[in-house]
Swiss-Prot record:
Top-level taxon in the UniProt lineage: Bacteria
Motif annotated as 'KMSKS' region, chain positions: 238-242
GO biological process terms, semicolon-separated: glutamyl-tRNA aminoacylation; tRNA modification
Motif interval(s): 'HIGH' region: 22-32
Protein name as catalogued: Glutamyl-Q tRNA(Asp) synthetase
Gene: gluQ
Purpose: Catalyzes the tRNA-independent activation of glutamate in presence of ATP and the subsequent transfer of glutamate onto a tRNA(Asp). Glutamate is transferred on the 2-amino-5-(4,5-dihydroxy-2-cyclopenten-1-yl) moiety of the queuosine in the wobble position of the QUC anticodon.
Cofactor(s) the protein requires to work: Zn(2+)
Record GO terms (molecular function): ATP binding; glutamate-tRNA ligase activity; zinc ion binding
Keyword Transmembrane helix: no
Keyword Nucleotide-binding: yes
Record-stated family: Belongs to the class-I aminoacyl-tRNA synthetase family. GluQ subfamily.
Length: 308
């Protein structure tokens, strides 16, 4: 028995659909732009749709006003999306239905293990609560892994092998604090939106096998995956909101777009200063070459706003 059709959209549309799904934990930075631009160019080069989803399911990590700022930043850099923005904060009903279905099928269970206990056994959950039949009080919900996914094909990097212990772990899909886990929400929403290919940063390679295992449990078609290289700051650390990466400049977006295109290994117009943002992006779509994107997970190339 598959999840109800009215809630989970079947991927019958063979047209390309890509997406960019930022969390509102801060403004977009250069690393965010690489992911947004790469997914945008891949979608447009395939004559496909490019969607934007705001992943606002973790209120403690959210910065007030960041979501709207992110949307304005995308517009400032010429990255206009198709259709309406999907907000995960408005999708709780879908996640609850997904949790209920998994529970009814015996594919999940309640777990009361603390983080301290799991760390004491090496950091990988050992299935301690799998057959203890706990109730929901003060408990997280874990997936009951039956056919772990230990590898997947990345269209840029080839076959990627996962850590076997991590791949076999019964991971959390609903947190003890009542929040929905990222892996559950992203799979439910990517399927609901009909996303056919996921283009994102290489920092999300690790959870991919878990997400694929969820697709398989639900009986859904698995999308293709492309993981783009990550940018470093001048100190050699990954650009991220946690590392206080500077927000994208609010001035002329063209030099930053050109820097992002260079980072992605793409051909750039020699006299780009004579081009508008729209013209730069049109040229980038026309010349987009996935095989030119560096395959390494982290590119030893630094960026700072001062360089623009």
């Amino acid at each position: 028995m598959l999840p109800p059709y009215f809630l989970f959209k079947e991927m019958t549309d063979t047209h390309y659909i890509g997406r960019f799904a930022p969390s509102p934990s801060g403004e977009l930075h250069f690393g965010s732009l690489i992911a947004a631009l790469g997914s945008y160019l891949q979608a447009r080069a395939r004559q496909g749709r490019w969607l934007v989803r705001i992943e606002d399911i973790d209120p403690p990590r959210e910065v007030p006003g960041a979501a709207e700022t992110i949307l304005r930043q995308l517009e400032h850099y010429g990255l206009y999306w198709d259709g309406d923005v999907l907000w995960q904060s408005q999708r709780h009903h879908a996640y609850r239905e997904a949790l209920a279905w998994l529970h009814e099928q015996g594919l999940s269970y309640y777990c009361t293990c603390t983080r301290a206990r799991i760390q004491s056994i090496g950091g990988i959950y050992d299935g301690h609560c799998r057959d203890l039949h706990h109730g929901p009080d003060n408990a997280a919900v874990r997936i009951r892994q039956q056919h772990p996914v230990t590898q997947f094909t990345d269209l840029l990097r080839g076959i990627i092998h996962a850590d076997e212990k991590l791949a076999r772990e019964d991971f959390i899909i609903h947190r003890r604090d009542g929040l929905f886990a990222y892996n559950l929400a992203v799979v439910v929403d990517d399927h609901f939106q009909g996303v056919s290919e996921i283009v994102r940063g290489a920092d999300l390679i690790e959870p991919t096998v878990r997400q694929i295992s969820l697709y398989q449990l639900f009986g859904w078609k698995v999308p293709d995956y492309i993981h783009l290289p990550l940018a470093l700051n001048p100190q050699g650390a990954k650009l991220s909101k946690q590392n206080h990466a500077p927000a994208l400049p609010k001035g002329d977006p063209r030099p930053v777009l050109i820097a992002a295109l260079h980072f992605l290994g793409q051909q750039v117009e020699t006299h780009w200063q004579d081009f508008s943002v729209e013209q730069i992006l049109q040229s980038a779509v026309k010349n987009w070459t996935l095989t030119a994107v560096p395959e390494s997970a982290i590119v030893n190339s630094t960026f700072s706003n001062a360089s623009c």
